[in-house]
Amino acid sequence: MNPMPSALPSDFLHVDLVTLSPLILLAAAAVVVMLTAAFYRHPRPVMILTLAGLVLSFMALFLSQGTASSQVTTLLILDQYALFFIGLIVVATFVVAILCYRYFGGGESRHEALYILLLLAALGGGVLVASSHFASFLLGLELLSISLFALIAYPRFTEHPLEAGIKYLILAGFSSGLLLFGMALVYAQLGTMQFVKIGTMLAAPGAALELYGLAGLALIVTGVGFKLALVPFHMWTPDVYEGAPVPITAFIATASKGAMLVLLLRYFLMAGAHQSHSITFALSLIAVATILVGNLLALLQNNIKRILAYSSIAQLGYLLVGFLAFDQLAIEAVAYFLTAYFVTMLGAFGVVTVLSEGFNGGSAGEFHDAGEKDSDRLADYAGLFWHRPWLAGVFTAMLLSLAGIPLTMGFIGKFYIVTAGVEASLWMPVITLVIGSIIGLFYYMRIIAVMYGWGPEAAGEAIMLRAASPSFAESATLAALALLLIWLGIFPAQLIGVLEGAGGGLT
């Protein structure tokens, strides 16, 4: 008679639980917030619990570092690479949660469910960046997407968010269908859904994807292209960015897109997809088109949210240039640029959020429930410097970083990306990146000129002057983002050292 299998060692369980603790704490925070909202309907304690859960999850990342490079299950790998980007997503969610409070009416409104959805979306993003299997890929993606549907359409009495939510729902469902079909085709040929096993099988002598396997890989890239808003899958982005509440737009632009890009890089490197010349050539064309289309269409916009939407499309094109190098330098370049992109977009949308609070003289809750528009027209920012100089300064720093001006994180990030592209001989994407950056200067400087170009007497009639003053938490958050942007733009060595360690396990 065979002996019964022994139980798992306690130290094994301890290591796994410690490694998974950032994700476990996010899930636990969502449950606690849900129960609190059910028994005590007031947004302040719910927001405080949300922020506390995010802080605990972030602190748990430091405990997980000692057990990193751990394949805790067949579905998840919590290495330094995953932990770094989970931390980035948690920080982005923390900032968005702070921005949401007054935007949705502060203590006078009932928006407790918003924080539950934010925590679930952050959990979905965390699962995505740690995925090493198609099942966890799909689980994280759907958890993130379903939360975003509700977040985008959250203001109940407004037409624009509902329209944006429906658009996102339809296109996200379509892209998920493409991803599923692509995964099925890859599985049909290789018989496995683990990224590492896919890479091992394709690395064997004489092994290659057959036609339907290549079709499956192409469908996966197409589905991810929709999520990242890469050209020609970008058409939903301006409408959703314009219609969604401003803090939620910030979350989509940062945590949602960042998680998808991080997952795509892991999949390409672990599964050996970067060895397919047809796929890399197609991605090169997509990168070139994304940079040009994003920058050129941004020139035609008079709405701040639409300008930032097209700018985010172009920024993802820049990231693809570094992505295509597929080496250690490329991983560091993508990680640094993505970090700069998070900081910059959170700061830019943070300023728009603050100026949209209490717009038209009412409280934030009255304004947004009344179906009025955000403070997002370019004309609303005329003379901002003369009455809100520090807000104009923060917004200027963010725009200069997006443009890649020296002494900002954006400059270091672009320099890193160009270096990786040149070393990989990606001449056409690199040249396009330089051209796109020059085009981008025009619409970034246009916004800056509007903020500084009007005199005090003309600015006195600007609509944005009736916006509410930012809270201490909002002011501190925006100031921290601006200081971080400049500090890491001048002294990037410490962050680069962290990224070298984080990306080392992927190559």
Swiss-Prot record:
It is found in: Cell inner membrane. Keywords: Cell inner membrane, Cell membrane, Membrane, NAD, Quinone, Translocase, Transmembrane, Transmembrane helix, Transport, Ubiquinone. InterPro entries: NADH-Q_OxRdtase_suN/2 (IPR010096), ND/Mrp_TM (IPR001750). It holds the Pfam family Proton_antipo_M. Belongs to the complex I subunit 2 family. HAMAP family: NDH1_NuoN_1 (MF_00445). NCBIfam families: NDH_I_N. This is NADH-quinone oxidoreductase subunit N. The lineage of its organism: Bacteria, Pseudomonadati, Pseudomonadota, Betaproteobacteria, Nitrosomonadales.
